[in-house]
């Protein structure tokens, strides 16, 4: 099949766009002049890919998606900000992903092997890692960071500048306004949709090969942070002492990741 056969005749591809010869484009899709797409990427029908957008290899973009659109930020003044997407990502129908803003690094970034379901919104300047799952209608505001292997439940909403740590899980229909430490489950409580901590993501960690010792260590750190009468600073000190007393290197590694994340919080951690 030639490249002409892989691009539907009704698609509008700007002549300055850089597309690998193996890229497939569906009917009535529009691709702007500053777009680049790597080998094996497939785009459905009625999709718009615009802005300074780079898509890596073997990505799948669903129908009616909007990728690389202008940021929804009233300070935006047509600066040439970017969206950079890695390899092997699935971006389903009606998803909107915007470029960055000059007030941040100017880049919205998405890593590799992410599963982004229908009607997801990823706003300007977000940084999404690898192997994440965004369930349908998950919405993240500007400047949000999502770590590797994190899962966002359907219809969840995340406030701007919030961080979601690696291997964390956010429950469906939850409103998140503070950081979720790595390895932690956060979900809405009874009587409202504001997210609250609900323990370590034990099942997810087991599926990904974490050891019993690592999980036990994380549970102990979680109890110090959330289930004790310690202040935040006291809990951090106790977790640091726990790390110092841990001989197992893999356990020490995950505990250090947990401790470093909570120490770096600016919005506070979910409570």
Swiss-Prot record:
<dbReference type="InterPro" id="IPR037157">
    <property type="entry name" value="Acetyltransf_C_sf"/>
</dbReference>
<keyword id="KW-0808">Transferase</keyword>
<dbReference type="GO" id="GO:0005737">
    <property type="term" value="C:cytoplasm"/>
</dbReference>
<dbReference type="InterPro" id="IPR011004">
    <property type="entry name" value="Trimer_LpxA-like_sf"/>
</dbReference>
<dbReference type="InterPro" id="IPR010137">
    <property type="entry name" value="Lipid_A_LpxA"/>
</dbReference>
<protein>
    <recommendedName>
        <fullName>Acyl-[acyl-carrier-protein]--UDP-N-acetylglucosamine O-acyltransferase</fullName>
        <ecNumber>2.3.1.129</ecNumber>
    </recommendedName>
</protein>
<dbReference type="Pfam" id="PF00132">
    <property type="entry name" value="Hexapep"/>
</dbReference>
<keyword id="KW-0963">Cytoplasm</keyword>
<keyword id="KW-0677">Repeat</keyword>
<dbReference type="InterPro" id="IPR018357">
    <property type="entry name" value="Hexapep_transf_CS"/>
</dbReference>
<dbReference type="GO" id="GO:0008780">
    <property type="term" value="F:acyl-[acyl-carrier-protein]-UDP-N-acetylglucosamine O-acyltransferase activity"/>
</dbReference>
<dbReference type="GO" id="GO:0016020">
    <property type="term" value="C:membrane"/>
</dbReference>
<keyword id="KW-0443">Lipid metabolism</keyword>
<comment type="subunit">
    <text>Homotrimer.</text>
</comment>
<keyword id="KW-0012">Acyltransferase</keyword>
<keyword id="KW-0441">Lipid A biosynthesis</keyword>
<comment type="function">
    <text>Involved in the biosynthesis of lipid A, a phosphorylated glycolipid that anchors the lipopolysaccharide to the outer membrane of the cell.</text>
</comment>
<dbReference type="InterPro" id="IPR029098">
    <property type="entry name" value="Acetyltransf_C"/>
</dbReference>
<keyword id="KW-0444">Lipid biosynthesis</keyword>
<comment type="similarity">
    <text>Belongs to the transferase hexapeptide repeat family. LpxA subfamily.</text>
</comment>
<dbReference type="InterPro" id="IPR001451">
    <property type="entry name" value="Hexapep"/>
</dbReference>
<comment type="pathway">
    <text>Glycolipid biosynthesis; lipid IV(A) biosynthesis; lipid IV(A) from (3R)-3-hydroxytetradecanoyl-[acyl-carrier-protein] and UDP-N-acetyl-alpha-D-glucosamine: step 1/6.</text>
</comment>
<dbReference type="GO" id="GO:0009245">
    <property type="term" value="P:lipid A biosynthetic process"/>
</dbReference>
<dbReference type="Pfam" id="PF13720">
    <property type="entry name" value="Acetyltransf_11"/>
</dbReference>
């Amino acid at each position: 099949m030639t490249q002409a056969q892989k691009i539907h005749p009704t698609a509008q591809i700007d002549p300055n766009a850089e597309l690998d010869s193996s890229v497939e484009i569906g009917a009535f899709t529009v691709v702007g002049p500053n777009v680049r797409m790597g080998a094996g990427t497939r785009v459905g029908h009625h999709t718009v890919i615009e802005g300074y957008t780079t898509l890596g290899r073997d990505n799948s973009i669903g129908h009616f998606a909007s990728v690389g659109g202008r940021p929804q930020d009233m300070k935006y003044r047509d600066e040439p900000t970017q969206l950079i997407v890695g390899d092997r990502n699935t971006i389903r129908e009606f998803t909107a992903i915007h470029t960055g803003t000059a007030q941040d690094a100017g880049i919205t970034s998405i890593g590799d092997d992410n599963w982004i379901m229908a009607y997801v919104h990823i706003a300007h300047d977000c940084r999404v890692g690898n192997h994440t799952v965004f369930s349908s209608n998950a919405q993240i505001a500007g400047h949000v960071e999502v770590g590797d292997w994190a899962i966002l439940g359907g219809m969840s909403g995340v406030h701007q500048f919030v961080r979601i740590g690696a291997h964390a899980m956010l429950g469906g229909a939850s409103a998140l306004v503070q950081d979720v430490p790595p390895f932690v489950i956060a979900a809405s409580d009874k009587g409202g949709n504001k997210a609250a901590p609900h323990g370590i993501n034990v099942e997810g960690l087991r599926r990904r090969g974490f050891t019993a010792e690592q999980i036990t260590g994380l549970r102990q750190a979680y109890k110090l942070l959330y289930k004790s009468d310690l202040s935040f600073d006291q809990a951090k000190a106790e977790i640091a002492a726990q790390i110092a007393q841990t001989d197992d290197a893999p356990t020490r590694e995950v505990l250090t990741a947990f401790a470093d994340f909570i120490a770096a919080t600016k919005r506070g951690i979910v409570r």
